[in-house]
Amino acid sequence: MNDQQFEQSDIRSQKANMMNSLTSRSIKRTLPIWLDNSFKSLLIVVMVFSISLARAAEPIIQEPTFSNEVVRVLQEKCQRCHQPGGIGPMPLETYEQARAWAPRIKENVRRRIMPPWHLDPTIGIQEYKNDFSLSEEQIQILVAWADNGAPEGDPADLPLPAEWPNWLEWELEPDLGTPDMVFESGPIAVRAEGGDFWPSIDVEWPALEKPRYLKAAEIRNTIKGRGALHHNNIRLDLEEGPSGRVVGAGAGKRWDYFGEDTGILFDVGPGVVNFGAHYFPIGVEFEDNIEVAFWFHPEDDPPETVASVEIHHLIDQFDPGQPRARDILIPPHGTQTMYRTWVLDEPVMLNSYRGHMHLHGIAMSIEVIWPGRVRDYYGPGANRRDVIASINNYNHNWQTSFVFADDARPILPAGTAIVMRTHFDNTENNPLSIDPDQWVVFGGRSVDAMSHFHVSVTYLEKDEYDSLLLTRLNQLSKRK
């Protein structure tokens, strides 16, 4: 076994141990009342944005086989991670590989632990560009296959093997071509022992000839580094023009693709690209290197929609009157709910969002409270407030950006209040709560608590808002 194979095997072993610890214990985490069934808002004000509610039950295939139905589900939703050298703890490409894990596959998909898409499928908008969750039919296929003894079926039914990019290459390159710009952090010394640490590295951003619009960005690092890097955020700080976080990477996520009609404005600069990383020692001393690649829209074909860099909302820094400068103070065997409200000064279209918590975080949500004139316009039947997204099964080990489908992006008028809630669980019901006997306070370590929301919006002029709203209303009327 060569060094690369050993490193990949070691990372898969770590992931397998983590998976075993997560799935061998009962997960009965205490959800707050605002995510309980009795308080689920179904977005009655559907005229303001497109919505698809809970997926309807689909016909169940009674006797699925690996060669026919199962492998096609695995290729579509699982093998991107579960392949040799991938971050999944085991490959799931062949019958022999999948058969050995059939009971675990059944349990994880039934409980929606895998694939790691942590949205509640019964609340809010369900249309996303990057949705890799399983449909109800796909879940039933995998569950029925395991219940029937995981039959192989006829190998003649097998599709061609899926082809995946090498994990040491850019995942987006086969679709988008060679990156337009690539930046490197340079060597980062990762120690074998000790506590977490957070290197912050600035690399010069050269002045551009003209502003460009970002179409996609991707982060990659070394194989060993993937086992020790919790997350890395790339920030662009320009002397003039928009600055902020552009892309983040964590377990299971290394790129953001904004689409053919959406882009983030990169002004000419100059400035710096900041690599903000979070490492935790894994018992091996090594040298890491982080790279970020940028793909731009063509200079002569700018996107229709200009998205903002990520707007960083600190939910854990809402009320300075709390006992700490940051509010998080979770008692032993207790829970805590926090929120932050963002009142819009101008109309916006919400493009994407991602939440960030640590081990004690279990749920997050985004709710909108409509301004009075919107309620008056749509009449007394309109809801006053609606939950547009509920991350009801948050998992600290996955850092996911949820990118709305183009026709599902919420269009919100000025005066709308966006309420971002987070919930922490420091009880024995949370398998990631390492020691429920201890108080938990704010901190950067994974064993401390933190609560952030990152959102990307497009700011709209009044005429743009009116035009988009009219277009959306016409689209909805055609669906009826």
Model segments located where?
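N-terminal secretory signal peptides that target proteins for export/translocation
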Residues: 1-37
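Residue-level detector of intrinsically disordered terminal segments
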Residues: 17-18, 46, 234
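N-terminal non-cleavable signal-anchor helices
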Residues: 12, 46-49, 61, 248
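Aromatic- and Gly/Pro-enriched helix-to-coil junctions and flexible linker segments
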Residues: 55-205, 209-212, 216, 223, ...
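Bacterial N-terminal signal peptides
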Residues: 38-50
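His-enriched metal-coordination microenvironments in redox/metal-binding proteins
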Residues: 166-458, 463, 472-480
